C-alpha cells in the first residue's frame, strides 16, 4: 500500500447511527501535510509557520492564528502549533498537531473505533514507507508509533478509541524534552533512599 492508495482501506466519511458523520482525513492528504511540517528546515518561526499554513491553503481561526482549519474535509479546526521562547522576544515553533479524525457525539463514539483502527494502520504503513520502521508503544491506552528523523524532528502518530492524530515535535522541542527527562532522572536518583 502506498500513501496514494491507503485511503481506499477505510471510508473517508461514515454515517453513524445517530446521523452524525465520522470523517477521516484521506491518507495521501494527511501524509503530505505531515511531511510539509516534519521536513521543514528547522528552526521555524511563527511567521514561517503561518506562511506554510498559507502555502497549504489552510485558514486560521478568527480567535487564535495558531489554530487552523485545513481543506481535509473534517469540518473543524484540526491543526495547531505551539511556540516557545527562543531568546529575548524571539519565539520558535516547538510542535505541530494535526487531527486525522473528526469529533463525534459521545453516544456513538464506539461505532467509529473500527474505522479509526484501520485509518491508524494505513497511516502507519504510509509513514513507514516514507520514514522507515517507527517505534511502536502503548501508554495509558494510547497506541502510538514514533519516528525520529535525521534532523531530530519527531513524528508521532497515535490512536485511542475513535481518535487518530499526529504530532510533530521540532528539534528544539526534543532537546528540551531530553533535558527535562535527564533532570528528573537525576532528581529521582538523588532522592532515592537506597542510594
Q: Each predicted region: which residue ranges?
A:
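Short helix/turn-capping signatures at newly exposed starts of structured segments
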Residues: 1-141, 152-154, 159-195
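Short hydrophobic/aromatic beta-strand element in the GNAT-like acyltransferase core
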Residues: 144
Amino acid at each position: 500500500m502506498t500513501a496514494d492508495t491507503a485511503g481506499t482501506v477505510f471510508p473517508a466519511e461514515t454515517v453513524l447511527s445517530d446521523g452524525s458523520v465520522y470523517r477521516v482525513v484521506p491518507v495521501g492528504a494527511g501524509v503530505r501535510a505531515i511531511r510539509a511540517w516534519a521536513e521543514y528546515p528547522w528552526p521555524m518561526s511563527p511567521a514561517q509557520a503561518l506562511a506554510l499554513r498559507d502555502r497549504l491553503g489552510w485558514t486560521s481561526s478568527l480567535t487564535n492564528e495558531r489554530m487552523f482549519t485545513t481543506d481535509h474535509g473534517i469540518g473543524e479546526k484540526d491543526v495547531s502549533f505551539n511556540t516557545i521562547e527562543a531568546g529575548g522576544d524571539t519565539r520558535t515553533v516547538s510542535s505541530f498537531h494535526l487531527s486525522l479524525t473528526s469529533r463525534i457525539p459521545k453516544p456513538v463514539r464506539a461505532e467509529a473505533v473500527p474505522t479509526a483502527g484501520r485509518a491508524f494502520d494505513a497511516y502507519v504503513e504510509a509513514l513507514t514507507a516514507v520514514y522507515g520502521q517507527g517505534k511502536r508503544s502503548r501508554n495509558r491506552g494510547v497506541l502510538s508509533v514514533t519516528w525520529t528523523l535525521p534532523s531530530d524532528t519527531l513524528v508521532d502518530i497515535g490512536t485511542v478509541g475513535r481518535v487518530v492524530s499526529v504530532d510533530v515535535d521540532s528539534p528544539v522541542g526534543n532537546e528540551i524534552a531530553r533535558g527535562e527527562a535527564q533532570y528528573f532522572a537525576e532528581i529521582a536518583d538523588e532522592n532515592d533512599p537506597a542510594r
